[in-house]
Amino acid sequence: MQTRNTLSWIKEEITRSISVSLMIYIITWASISNAYPIFAQQGYENPREATGRIVCANCHLANKPVDIEVPQAVLPDTVFEAVVRIPYDMQLKQVLANGKKGGLNVGAVLILPEGFELAPPDRISPEMKEKIGNLSFQNYRPTQKKILVIGPVPGQKYSEITFPILSPDPATNKDVHFLKYPIYVGGNRGRGQIYPDGRKSNNTVYNATAAGIVSKILRKEKGGYEITIVDASDGRQVVDIIPPGPELLVSEGESIKLDQPLTSNPNVGGFGQGDAEIVLQDPSRVQGLLFFLASVVLAQIFLVLKKKQFEKVQLSEMNF
């Protein structure tokens, strides 16, 4: 009887442990999935404002370059590469959320013309799959197939990102025409300086919220500082909280001004945006051009032959 009770107790404990572990996994996975890949998805219906500015610049304040390469023209219902390059110095290390230093991550948003979309896996060639690697692209919104996002992903491996794009066919999509279209891109390297809710991250400079004397600097156990400033005008104490990461620039007893930097700016990344143009080419126009070029070549050949024939006739007449 005692053995049966013991086995029953062990079974209950194992079941409880599995349930707790499963709950922890689900909660952890949910928090991670909600945080990635693009913060802008949480607060903006469209990543490109009416002014042309891509909203990622609201959180990534430093301006850095980005480059996009696409074919000059594509045929309908064709898979092509849109290559986005996010250059940066691979030796750089960024401040992580815990205040430690680590490698930079990168991310990108690609805004395609109407009708263009991510190519289905069965249409992607093995060579293109090799260039894509293990990247997983997603739509900015389920209903917006023309806007693609990726990241954050390790910058050491993916500073060049290849998007596989499928061009539309005007024969099946009446909203698409054979025209020249713009493509917009935004790319960032490193963490942002501001979270979507307006809070500062630890990857930015912190300024004094009052003018006065630094009366106390308390180094917190888990990193960061509490800086007490005695206001010069009324003697009240103001406490500025500095998270782990930025390096302190002031010391106790120092006189500081309002908005004076209390820390260095640890940010080594930034955001950039660019654009390119692509022509959706009508196959019949291409065929017409080829026919025209072929006719020109044939005309030139016949002209040369005719000229040689004429020269032979002249030569024979002279000999006669």
From Swiss-Prot:
Ligase among keywords: no
Free-text cofactor note: Binds 1 heme group covalently.
Record membrane topology: Single-pass membrane protein
One Pfam family here: Apocytochr_F_C
GO cellular component terms, A-Z: chloroplast thylakoid membrane
Binding-site positions, heme: Y36, C56, C59, H60
GO biological processes: photosynthesis
Localization (cell): Plastid, Chloroplast thylakoid membrane
Alphabetic keyword roster: Chloroplast, Electron transport, Heme, Iron, Membrane, Metal-binding, Photosynthesis, Plastid, Signal, Thylakoid, Transmembrane, Transmembrane helix, Transport
Known cofactor(s): heme
Family: Belongs to the cytochrome f family.
Name of the protein in question: Cytochrome f
Gene assigned in the entry: petA
